[in-house]
Amino acid sequence: CADKKPQQELTPWGTPVGEVESMDGSDDEESDGNAADSDAGAQAQQRGLSLSDIQDNGELIMLTVNGPTTYYDYHNHGMGLQYLLCEKFAQQIGVSLRVEECKDTTEMIQKLQKGEGDIIAVPLPRHILKGEKSSAGKNKTAAKSVSGDSKTINLLFCGVTPDKGKTQWAGVGGNKSLADTLNGWFKPKLIANVKKEESFLLSTASIRRHVYSPFLNRSKGVISRYDHLFMRYSGTARMDWRLMAAQCYQESCFDPNAKSWAGACGLMQIMPSTAAHLGLPMSAIHDAEANVAAAARYMAELQGHFSDVGDPAQRALFALAAYNGGFHHIRDAMALTRKYGGNPQNWGHVREYVLRLTQPAYYGDPVVKYGYMRGTETADYVDRIRARWSEYCGGASFHESYRGGSRGPHIGRGADSFNGAPVKSKRNYQRKYHI
């Protein structure tokens, strides 16, 4: 695909360098009445909620931006180093954590000033605020008000500092109790510990499996003890039963009792929220047939979301990607593909932009509505299922035909255009189903 994206230096959270150097707002022409709040209200905003107020409310409001190290949604769970650190701090003070996602640093400071958040949980470089150290202390910076009036807001840098003081979280200057608690709680080793925890959560090792399910009968082509279920429900899913089997292996290694840290359960690793949407009670989520049947309905639903993708084989790949990475993220990648001259109905083209949604220049693009995604994981998920399906079919590649039948669509031999990328032929492959 043609890629004409101009190169631009970005901060770690995706804001173009220099964009927030001037904190002056664009509302200078508003009337004085709109520019000024009551003095009492302004003072209350600048003080912010005290630690005891936050604890009484039972909620800490985290202001952040979307990104791989700040905050992103991963299978309906918050993820990102700064989010996980803030979550641990919220647990420490006995409250829940609510995330307010902002588009840039300026919006975070605006919301903090208005009392719409308690803490900016993004390491802010002090120099971007163009402030001078106040007499109140070395960690307090007075910055021009982002609302454009004559008021100032005191930011109190506190808590997490990943780089020896060059950057740090920030709260409202008057909120000393919250800042002192954050400073007392934070220890540099927390960053390393949380990084290890995040790495584990994102690994397959975090899925608790109870059985190992090898290929049952190579000579007779029996893939698993659940083949009859894949055959029965592949028509509902609108996919070849062996493709469904390959997806199941990727999800759970054919373990009906598998459970991930995020709560995904069963053969097809269905999330509780998805189970509720599909009418699958949690009491039945580990039942093999109920789980496969629900997953088949969900795959059919996802394929319906991609009804604009004309080729059924391509549509199946888009649905697999959405099963793993989320429908909205795949739509974002399709929008990028269209913008930069690719074919948004070809998985091979869209896959490239799924991968690029890990980069600030792309997940910050105006056509992207849902931000950062772990694109490498989703691309790998589809690649592995596709390769395993090829093994199950005796070395066929994903392409030539995808026609309906009593057991669901059948993917024929030959073919490398199923995902738009070539696949090395495995016709001489001696059925080594290494599972």
Describe the function of each predicted region.
Residues 205-254, 289-292, 306-310, 403:
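Export/targeting segments at the very N-terminus of extracytoplasmic proteins
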Residues 7-124, 182, 230:
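Extracytoplasmic small-molecule ligand-binding "clamshell" domains
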Residues 257-283, 290-301, 385:
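Substrate-binding/active-site groove segments that recognize
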Residues 44-47, 52-53, 69, 79, ...:
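Acidic, polar ligand-binding/catalytic clefts
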Residues 1-4:
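Bacterial signal peptide processing site
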Residues 38, 183-222, 338, 389, ...:
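Ligand-binding clefts/hinges and TM-proximal coupling segments of bilobed small-molecule sensing domains
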Residues 377-435:
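Low-complexity, Gly/Ser/Thr/Pro-rich intrinsically disordered linker/tail segments
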Residues 167-171, 317-391:
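Catalytic and substrate-binding regions of cell-wall glycan-acting enzymes that process beta-1,4-linked
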